[in-house]
């Protein structure tokens, strides 16, 4: 397979570290640079615990793109930084794979239009775990037969956004197969505000944040005399790397924006 030159934004994060290891063990991936505002001017190999890769680190993406030739930007930073990075990447005609969440519908619409105009491949993935993507697809299928559904997403206590991008994407897919319905008693009240979670077209999303968790989600469907639960668990960040690899390889052949890994797997 042809070599793919990759820039990683956020190499010191837990996802970023796994992505660096992915670069090292994948023959056709070449890590040509990284973005880390604290370690500009150093190399990946200078960072504690990192493999012996000589990829230079830049403090900002602007400077990096001026000096480095790359095929794909892999962004694993924060929602705020990720939005800035994908906007710049599209402007510069650089393909990107974005693993941060928190994009609004309006932001996604604008990015989709910009990517289409520039004909630049872009993938925004709320979740890179193949199992999580299948969970979302199975939930979408089940929604045709079960109108009553609630989502419980559980993540580590350092996650910044709630509900998770995976939960939001799951609800979006369920809504495509489900007639809008308010669940529970029509006169239901909350004795404590927020007790029933976020409400999207009658679908309640509950967010749990605890140390010891990584990324987990349950989609619970209820029917007469029965329940169906679709669950996925990621026990470490290595679970996301198969999706990262697939996304980097796939974005090379795209000329538009794709939101969600479910749109690039068969």
UniProtKB/Swiss-Prot annotation:
Its main location: cytoplasm. It is found in: Cytoplasm. Pathway: Amino-acid biosynthesis; L-lysine biosynthesis via DAP pathway; (S)-tetrahydrodipicolinate from L-aspartate: step 4/4. Its EC number is 1.17.1.8. It comes from the Bacteria. (S)-2,3,4,5-tetrahydrodipicolinate binds at residues 156, 165-166. The keyword NADP applies. One of its GO terms (cellular component) is cytosol. NAD(+) binds at residues 10-15, 99-101, 125-128. It catalyses: (S)-2,3,4,5-tetrahydrodipicolinate + NAD(+) + H2O = (2S,4S)-4-hydroxy-2,3,4,5-tetrahydrodipicolinate + NADH + H(+); (S)-2,3,4,5-tetrahydrodipicolinate + NADP(+) + H2O = (2S,4S)-4-hydroxy-2,3,4,5-tetrahydrodipicolinate + NADPH + H(+). GO terms for biological process: diaminopimelate biosynthetic process; lysine biosynthetic process via diaminopimelate. Catalyzes the conversion of 4-hydroxy-tetrahydrodipicolinate (HTPA) to tetrahydrodipicolinate. This is 4-hydroxy-tetrahydrodipicolinate reductase. It comes from Bacillus mycoides (strain KBAB4).
């Amino acid at each position: 397979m042809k070599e793919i030159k990759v820039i990683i934004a956020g190499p010191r994060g837990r996802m970023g570290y796994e992505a660096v290891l992915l670069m090292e063990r994948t023959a056709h991936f070449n890590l040509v640079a990284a973005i880390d505002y604290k370690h500009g001017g150093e190399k990946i190999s200078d960072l504690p615990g990192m493999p012996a890769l000589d990829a230079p680190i830049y403090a900002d993406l602007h400077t990096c793109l001026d000096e480095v030739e790359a095929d794909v930007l892999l962004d694993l930073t924060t929602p705020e930084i990720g939005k800035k990075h994908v906007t710049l990447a599209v402007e510069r005609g650089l393909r990107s794979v974005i693993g941060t969440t928190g994009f609004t519908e309006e932001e996604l619409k604008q990015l989709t239009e910009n990517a289409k105009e520039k004909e630049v491949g872009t993938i925004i993935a709320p979740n890179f775990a193949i199992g999580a993507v299948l969970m979302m697809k199975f939930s979408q299928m089940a929604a045709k037969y079960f109108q009553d559904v609630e989502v419980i997403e559980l993540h580590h206590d350092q996650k910044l956004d709630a509900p998770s991008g995976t939960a939001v994407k799951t609800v979006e897919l369920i809504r495509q197969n489900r007639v809008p319905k308010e669940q529970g008693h029509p006169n239901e009240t909350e004795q404590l505000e927020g007790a029933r979670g976020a409400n999207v077209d009658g679908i309640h999303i509950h967010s749990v944040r605890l140390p010891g968790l990584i990324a987990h989600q349950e989609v619970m469907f209820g029917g007469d005399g029965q329940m169906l639960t679709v669950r996925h668990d990621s026990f470490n960040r290595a679970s996301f790397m198969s999706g990262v690899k697939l996304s980097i390889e796939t974005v090379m052949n795209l000329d538009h924006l794709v939101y969600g890994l479910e749109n690039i797997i068969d």
